[in-house]
């Protein structure tokens, strides 16, 4: 491959050169949403983070199988395997079938992801569609001696596993810390110790979502689904497993334990985790009740919002921070992102207005190299964006006559902006934003202004003024130049 990509491996706590197990093929699994409510800003971050990774790996020439699951069963209210299934609870409260809840919110999630220009994964498996695979996983762990049956449920024996392996190697915890911080909850008497986690839960009589198993009717534990589905679609060993850093413990720690217990080693080579979106320093999330949904951002309908923000503003806002850095929500930060995005899109539009010269005194090759170097450095999107802003200054200086650019360099500059703005960062011009409207109305405005040029040549000042005044009233700024005209749509 042309580029040497390094990524931060949470397991080893350092940046490592990315070397696929079976190049040019790459297997990537990312934990998707539990679909019992509308997607919020916290859901957007992992989706955008791993969308950029998917795009970049594809750009580097890899053939990526990207699996992003849908959790539609087994995610209980508490990590200690207690409480009601989140989807079943929503269904009970709204007097719906659980799969009605799943389908409704999954449709809305897909719509929000499409608005954010997040590419669909190669495969989007549902936990409820892979019960057989999860039962087989539980059987293997039982056969290996790292699980036990208790009153119709099956639990992973963390203490026994820890004697032979290292439970806590991903999160940096040791078993004593886990035991000391595990809450004693009702129903824990089924477990040998409070740190044990459910592989299969017995269904109470009132529990709607249930399947037959060798241990009686029940449902899979939350952690089992990703191990089972990752193995089914990516094999016993694959390259990347991603998700939010809030999943490191217990979810991903438990996945490693399940993998090692069932097949003897870890399935995953690189573990990647994005940091959190916060509001006033507190993690944004459904369980905390402090979230703002993506639809509320797009409409401006939440009380904390001073205005609506377009999907591309949200995407740009997230990409302005490195994926491993926290991002704190504020209207000021989003408004700054909105202005920055507008500057970048104006630069892209201005590329079409440049007339090439015979020679160049700008360094396009260096700009391209710097952008790739930033992406190769653990997907450093904020540095890529800063280089693109340098490119925007280059464009403005060329238009102002301070620099010149040859036809070949202009072609390369257009390619740099298209590759990084659109193909890799996944930005797009939006109909409804000023940039999107410029793209949509461009030919019509150009045609009208060409008529105005003809009117002026014929000294038809009334028609010339009428066209200018009408376009100005619609928000277009018209500038006469020696070559004809320039225009832009003001916000």
Curated annotation (Swiss-Prot):
GO terms for molecular function: ATP binding; cysteine-tRNA ligase activity; zinc ion binding. Zn(2+) binds at residues 31, 226, 251, 255. Binds 1 zinc ion per subunit. Belongs to the class-I aminoacyl-tRNA synthetase family. It is found in: Cytoplasm. The lineage of its organism: Bacteria, Pseudomonadati, Bacteroidota, Bacteroidia, Bacteroidales. SMART domains: DALR_2. One of its GO terms (biological process) is cysteinyl-tRNA aminoacylation. Its main location: cytoplasm. Its cofactor is Zn(2+). This is Cysteine--tRNA ligase. ATP binds at residue 286. A motif ('HIGH' region) lies at residues 33-43. Its EC number is 6.1.1.16. Gene3D superfamilies: Cysteine-tRNA ligase, C-terminal anti-codon recognition domain (1.20.120.1910), HUPs (3.40.50.620). InterPro entries: Cys-tRNA-ligase (IPR015803), Cys-tRNA-synt_Ia_DALR (IPR015273), Cys-tRNA/MSH_ligase (IPR024909), CysS_C (IPR056411), Rossmann-like_a/b/a_fold (IPR014729), tRNA-synt_1_cat_dom (IPR032678), tRNAsynth_Ia_anticodon-bd (IPR009080). One of its GO terms (cellular component) is cytosol. It is an enzyme of class 6 (ligase).
């Amino acid at each position: 491959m042309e580029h040497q990509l390094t990524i931060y491996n949470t397991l080893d706590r350092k940046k490592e050169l990315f070397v696929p197990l079976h190049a040019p093929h790459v297997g990537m699994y990312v934990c998707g949403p539990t679909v019992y409510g509308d997607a919020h800003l916290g859901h957007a971050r992992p989706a955008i983070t791993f969308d950029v990774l998917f795009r970049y790996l594809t750009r580097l020439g890899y053939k990526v199988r990207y699996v992003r699951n849908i959790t539609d069963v087994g995610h209980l209210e508490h990590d200690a395997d207690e409480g009601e299934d989140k989807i079943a609870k929503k269904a009970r409260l709204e007097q719906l079938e659980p799969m009605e809840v799943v389908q409704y919110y999954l449709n809305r999630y897909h719509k929000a992801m499409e608005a954010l220009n997040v590419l669909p994964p190669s495969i989007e498996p549902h936990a409820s569609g892979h019960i057989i695979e999860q039962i087989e996983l539980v059987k293997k762990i039982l056969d290996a001696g790292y699980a036990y049956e208790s009153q119709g449920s099956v639990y992973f024996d963390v203490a026994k596993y820890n004697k032979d392996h290292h439970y806590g190697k991903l999160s940096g915890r040791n078993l004593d810390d886990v035991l000391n911080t595990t809450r004693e909850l009702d129903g824990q008497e089924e477990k040998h110790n409070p740190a044990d986690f459910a592989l299969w839960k017995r269904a109470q009589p009132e529990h709607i979502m249930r399947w037959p198993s060798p241990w009686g009717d029940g449902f899979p534990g939350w952690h089992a689904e990703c191990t089972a589905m990752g193995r089914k679609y990516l094999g016993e060993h694959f390259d990347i497993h991603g998700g939010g850093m809030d999943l490191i413990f217990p979810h991903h720690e438990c996945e490693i334990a399940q993998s090692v217990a069932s097949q003897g080693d870890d399935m995953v080579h690189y573990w990647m985790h994005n940091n959190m979106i916060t509001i006033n320093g507190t993690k944004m999330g459904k369980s905390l009740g402090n979230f703002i949904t993506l639809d509320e951002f797009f409409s401006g309908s939440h009380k904390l919002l001073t205005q609506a923000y377009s999907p591309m503003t949200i995407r740009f806002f997230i990409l302005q921070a490195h994926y491993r850095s926290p991002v704190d929500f504020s209207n000021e930060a989003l408004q700054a992102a909105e202005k920055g995005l507008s500057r970048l899109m104006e630069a892209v539009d201005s590329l079409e207005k440049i007339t090439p010269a015979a020679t160049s005194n700008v360094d396009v090759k260096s700009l391209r190299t710097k952008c790739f170097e930033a992406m190769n450095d653990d997907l450093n999107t904020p540095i890529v964006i800063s280089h693109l802003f340098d490119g925007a200054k280059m464009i403005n200086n060329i238009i102002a006559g301070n620099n010149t650019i040859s036809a070949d360099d202009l072609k390369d500059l257009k390619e740099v902006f298209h590759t990084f703005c659109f193909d890799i960062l996944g930005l797009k011009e939006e109909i409804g934003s000023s940039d999107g409207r410029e793209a949509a109305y461009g030919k019509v405005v150009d045609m009208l202004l060409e008529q105005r040029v003809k009117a002026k040549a014929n000294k038809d000042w009334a028609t010339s003024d009428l066209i200018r005044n009408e376009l100005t009233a619609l928000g277009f700024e018209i500038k006469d130049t020696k070559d004809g005209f320039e225009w832009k749509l003001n916000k």
